[in-house]
Protein backbone atom coordinates (compact mmCIF):
# COMPACT_ATOMS: atom_id res chain seq x y z
CA UNK A 1 0.00 0.00 0.00
CA UNK A 2 1.33 3.47 -0.90
CA UNK A 3 2.07 5.76 2.03
CA UNK A 4 2.45 9.50 1.37
CA UNK A 5 5.97 10.75 2.27
CA UNK A 6 4.66 13.21 4.88
CA UNK A 7 2.65 10.47 6.63
CA UNK A 8 5.86 8.42 6.77
CA UNK A 9 7.73 11.44 8.18
CA UNK A 10 5.27 12.15 11.00
CA UNK A 11 4.89 8.42 11.78
CA UNK A 12 8.66 8.11 12.13
CA UNK A 13 8.91 11.38 14.11
CA UNK A 14 6.33 10.19 16.65
CA UNK A 15 7.93 6.76 17.00
CA UNK A 16 11.62 7.82 17.06
CA UNK A 17 12.07 11.58 17.46
CA UNK A 18 15.85 11.42 18.09
CA UNK A 19 16.46 9.42 14.93
CA UNK A 20 14.56 11.97 12.84
CA UNK A 21 15.86 15.07 14.63
CA UNK A 22 13.61 17.57 12.77
CA UNK A 23 10.06 18.83 13.20
CA UNK A 24 9.31 18.96 9.44
CA UNK A 25 11.21 17.92 6.29
CA UNK A 26 13.76 20.46 4.99
CA UNK A 27 12.50 23.20 2.68
CA UNK A 28 13.39 23.82 -0.97
CA UNK A 29 15.82 26.67 -0.19
CA UNK A 30 17.88 24.47 2.12
CA UNK A 31 17.79 21.66 -0.46
CA UNK A 32 19.14 24.05 -3.13
CA UNK A 33 21.99 25.23 -0.89
CA UNK A 34 22.86 21.65 0.17
CA UNK A 35 23.18 20.58 -3.47
CA UNK A 36 24.51 23.85 -4.96
CA UNK A 37 28.14 22.70 -5.38
CA UNK A 38 27.37 19.31 -6.87
CA UNK A 39 28.38 19.07 -10.50
CA UNK A 40 25.82 16.72 -12.10
CA UNK A 41 28.31 15.07 -14.46
CA UNK A 42 31.17 14.66 -11.95
CA UNK A 43 30.35 11.14 -10.75
CA UNK A 44 28.51 9.20 -8.07
CA UNK A 45 26.79 10.86 -5.11
CA UNK A 46 25.68 9.28 -1.85
CA UNK A 47 22.84 10.70 0.23
CA UNK A 48 22.60 9.79 3.93
CA UNK A 49 19.28 10.06 5.77
CA UNK A 50 17.11 11.15 2.81
CA UNK A 51 13.85 10.92 4.78
CA UNK A 52 11.07 12.03 2.41
CA UNK A 53 13.59 12.83 -0.37
CA UNK A 54 13.78 16.64 -0.39
CA UNK A 55 17.53 16.63 -1.18
CA UNK A 56 17.11 13.66 -3.53
CA UNK A 57 14.64 15.64 -5.64
CA UNK A 58 17.00 18.67 -5.67
CA UNK A 59 19.95 16.52 -6.81
CA UNK A 60 17.91 15.04 -9.68
CA UNK A 61 16.62 18.51 -10.59
CA UNK A 62 20.25 19.70 -10.91
CA UNK A 63 20.66 17.02 -13.58
CA UNK A 64 22.40 14.28 -11.60
CA UNK A 65 21.55 11.02 -13.40
CA UNK A 66 19.42 8.75 -11.17
CA UNK A 67 21.90 5.89 -11.77
CA UNK A 68 24.63 7.96 -10.09
CA UNK A 69 22.69 8.45 -6.85
CA UNK A 70 22.48 6.06 -3.88
CA UNK A 71 20.35 6.69 -0.80
CA UNK A 72 21.21 5.21 2.61
CA UNK A 73 18.22 5.37 4.96
CA UNK A 74 17.82 3.49 8.24
CA UNK A 75 14.14 4.10 8.94
CA UNK A 76 11.85 1.43 7.42
CA UNK A 77 8.92 3.82 6.96
CA UNK A 78 10.80 5.89 4.36
CA UNK A 79 12.01 3.02 2.16
CA UNK A 80 8.87 2.23 0.10
CA UNK A 81 7.92 5.92 -0.42
CA UNK A 82 11.49 6.65 -1.62
CA UNK A 83 11.45 3.66 -3.99
CA UNK A 84 8.05 4.71 -5.35
CA UNK A 85 9.01 8.36 -5.82
CA UNK A 86 12.51 7.69 -7.25
CA UNK A 87 12.26 4.33 -9.06
CA UNK A 88 15.63 4.69 -10.85
CA UNK A 89 17.63 5.66 -7.75
CA UNK A 90 19.29 2.95 -5.61
CA UNK A 91 17.72 2.93 -2.13
CA UNK A 92 19.54 0.98 0.59
CA UNK A 93 17.99 0.35 3.97
CA UNK A 94 21.22 0.58 5.91
CA UNK A 95 22.75 2.19 8.99
CA UNK A 96 25.16 4.92 7.85
CA UNK A 97 27.55 3.59 10.52
CA UNK A 98 28.31 0.71 8.13
CA UNK A 99 29.70 2.89 5.33
CA UNK A 100 33.32 1.83 5.89
CA UNK A 101 32.44 -1.74 4.92
CA UNK A 102 30.47 -0.72 1.81
CA UNK A 103 33.35 0.31 -0.48
CA UNK A 104 33.14 -2.75 -2.75
CA UNK A 105 29.37 -2.36 -3.08
CA UNK A 106 29.17 1.43 -3.47
CA UNK A 107 32.43 2.32 -5.21
CA UNK A 108 33.99 5.77 -4.95
CA UNK A 109 31.83 8.86 -4.63
CA UNK A 110 32.40 12.51 -5.55
CA UNK A 111 30.11 13.90 -2.85
CA UNK A 112 28.03 12.94 0.17
CA UNK A 113 24.88 14.88 1.07
CA UNK A 114 23.81 14.22 4.65
CA UNK A 115 20.60 14.99 6.48
CA UNK A 116 21.68 12.92 9.50
CA UNK A 117 20.86 14.33 12.96
CA UNK A 118 24.46 14.34 14.27
CA UNK A 119 23.50 16.46 17.29
CA UNK A 120 21.48 13.46 18.56
CA UNK A 121 24.33 10.96 18.08
CA UNK A 122 27.25 9.93 20.32
CA UNK A 123 30.70 11.05 19.18
CA UNK A 124 31.82 7.47 18.33
CA UNK A 125 28.88 7.10 15.95
CA UNK A 126 29.61 10.45 14.26
CA UNK A 127 33.26 9.41 13.90
CA UNK A 128 32.25 6.08 12.32
CA UNK A 129 29.85 7.74 9.87
CA UNK A 130 32.07 10.63 8.79
CA UNK A 131 35.22 8.45 8.70
CA UNK A 132 33.34 5.77 6.73
CA UNK A 133 32.00 8.44 4.38
CA UNK A 134 35.50 9.78 3.65
CA UNK A 135 36.74 6.24 2.99
CA UNK A 136 34.35 6.31 0.00
CA UNK A 137 35.06 9.86 -1.17
CA UNK A 138 37.45 10.50 -4.05
CA UNK A 139 40.30 12.97 -3.70
CA UNK A 140 38.68 16.43 -3.67
CA UNK A 141 35.32 14.98 -2.62
CA UNK A 142 33.14 16.81 -0.10
CA UNK A 143 30.63 15.88 2.59
CA UNK A 144 27.72 18.36 2.89
CA UNK A 145 25.92 18.57 6.22
CA UNK A 146 23.22 20.89 7.52
CA UNK A 147 22.57 21.87 11.09
CA UNK A 148 20.06 23.98 13.01
CA UNK A 149 22.91 25.18 15.25
CA UNK A 150 25.51 27.87 14.59
CA UNK A 151 28.54 25.56 14.43
CA UNK A 152 29.13 22.44 12.38
CA UNK A 153 27.34 19.43 13.92
CA UNK A 154 30.46 17.29 13.40
CA UNK A 155 32.45 18.18 16.55
CA UNK A 156 35.88 19.78 16.04
CA UNK A 157 37.57 16.83 17.84
CA UNK A 158 36.15 14.46 15.24
CA UNK A 159 37.20 16.74 12.38
CA UNK A 160 40.73 16.95 13.83
CA UNK A 161 41.00 13.20 14.39
CA UNK A 162 39.98 12.52 10.78
CA UNK A 163 42.12 15.30 9.22
CA UNK A 164 39.09 17.27 8.05
CA UNK A 165 37.93 20.87 8.07
CA UNK A 166 34.43 22.37 7.89
CA UNK A 167 33.49 25.59 6.11
CA UNK A 168 30.07 27.20 6.26
CA UNK A 169 28.49 27.52 2.82
CA UNK A 170 25.63 29.65 4.04
CA UNK A 171 22.58 29.95 6.24
CA UNK A 172 18.95 29.57 5.17
CA UNK A 173 16.80 31.77 7.39
CA UNK A 174 13.62 30.81 5.58
CA UNK A 175 13.81 27.18 6.63
CA UNK A 176 11.87 25.75 9.56
CA UNK A 177 13.94 26.01 11.72
CA UNK A 178 16.65 28.19 10.09
CA UNK A 179 19.63 26.04 9.12
CA UNK A 180 23.29 26.33 8.08
CA UNK A 181 25.09 24.18 5.52
CA UNK A 182 28.71 23.07 6.02
CA UNK A 183 31.13 21.66 3.47
CA UNK A 184 33.50 19.17 5.11
CA UNK A 185 36.68 18.31 3.21
CA UNK A 186 40.14 16.85 3.74
CA UNK A 187 42.69 19.35 5.11
CA UNK A 188 45.54 18.24 2.86
CA UNK A 189 43.67 18.97 -0.40
C1 LIG B 1 16.52 15.29 9.97
S1 LIG B 1 15.88 13.89 9.06
C2 LIG B 1 16.38 14.53 7.45
C3 LIG B 1 15.50 14.05 6.34
C4 LIG B 1 15.72 14.81 5.01
N1 LIG B 1 17.08 14.69 4.53
C5 LIG B 1 15.36 16.28 5.17
O1 LIG B 1 16.30 17.10 5.27
O2 LIG B 1 14.16 16.60 5.21
C6 LIG B 1 17.13 12.64 9.46
C7 LIG B 1 17.08 11.38 8.59
O3 LIG B 1 18.21 10.55 8.91
C8 LIG B 1 17.77 9.19 9.04
N2 LIG B 1 18.75 8.50 9.90
C9 LIG B 1 18.96 8.70 11.23
N3 LIG B 1 19.97 7.91 11.66
C10 LIG B 1 20.41 7.22 10.57
C11 LIG B 1 21.47 6.27 10.37
N4 LIG B 1 22.23 5.86 11.39
N5 LIG B 1 21.66 5.76 9.12
C12 LIG B 1 20.87 6.17 8.07
N6 LIG B 1 19.86 7.06 8.21
C13 LIG B 1 19.62 7.58 9.44
C14 LIG B 1 16.38 9.34 9.64
O4 LIG B 1 15.60 8.17 9.48
C15 LIG B 1 15.84 10.53 8.83
O5 LIG B 1 15.35 10.11 7.57
Specify the residue positions occupied by each region the protein language model found.
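S-adenosyl-L-methionine
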Residues: 1-40
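Conserved SAM/SAH-binding beta-strand->alpha-helix loop
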Residues: 75
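A short glycine-rich, Lys/Arg-flanked "PGG" loop and its adjoining helix->strand segment in the class I
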Residues: 127-139
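Core SAM-dependent methyltransferase catalytic element
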Residues: 171-189
